[in-house]
Regions:
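Catalytic loop of short-chain dehydrogenase/reductase
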Residues: 1-32, 37-46, 58-60
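Conserved SDR Rossmann-fold cofactor-binding beta-strand/turn motif
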Residues: 2, 50-60, 101, 114-116
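Generic structural signal for alpha-helix termini and adjacent loop/cap motifs
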Residues: 11, 39, 85, 102-106
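A glycine/serine/threonine-rich, flexible loop-to-helix segment
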Residues: 12-16, 46, 53-82, 122
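Short C-terminal tail/terminal secondary-structure segment
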Residues: 13, 98, 109-122
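Short, small/polar-rich loop/turn modules that mediate ligand/substrate recognition or access, typified
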Residues: 45-50, 108-110
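A conserved structural motif in NAD(P)-dependent oxidoreductases
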Residues: 82-93, 104
Length: 122
């Protein structure tokens, strides 16, 4: 699982008025995951093992690593950045994971499937 912060810099405005703070190390780790998955795909392809990642936008629910839910201010700030004006439901991200596990995606490897309601296109 990856994040749009692995392909774009963080938008600090989405944290304004919330108790959340941006974490620059998070972007570094997620960007590294993009490259790592491509390198793994280039090696393991010879064994017919496919390696892909999901790059998700914000997901409705709890804050990662916390029992706290996202504040309404964060959801409002975040939603303004997406074409669909909302965060993803967990099952919407899960559908991408399922797709990549199916035979219908058997020729896909080394890819980062972006599921972000258009955030990365802005």
């Amino acid at each position: 699982m990856n994040s749009i912060y692995g392909i774009l810099g963080q938008d600090l405005n989405i944290y304004k008025g919330t108790n959340m703070e941006p974490n620059p190390i998070y972007s570094l780790i997620k960007g590294g995951l993009n490259t790592f998955s491509k390198n793994m795909a280039s090696y393991y392809g010879q064994y017919s093992i496919r390696i892909n990642t999901i790059i998700s936008g914000g997901i409705e629910g709890h804050i990662a690593g916390s029992k706290n839910k996202q504040s309404s201010k964060f959801k409002s700030n975040y939603s303004k950045k997406t074409f669909l004006k909302r965060l993803a439901k967990p099952q919407e991200i899960a559908r991408g994971v399922v797709f990549l596990s199916l035979d219908k995606s058997s020729y896909i490897t080394g890819s980062n499937l972006v599921i972000d309601a258009g955030w990365s296109a802005t």
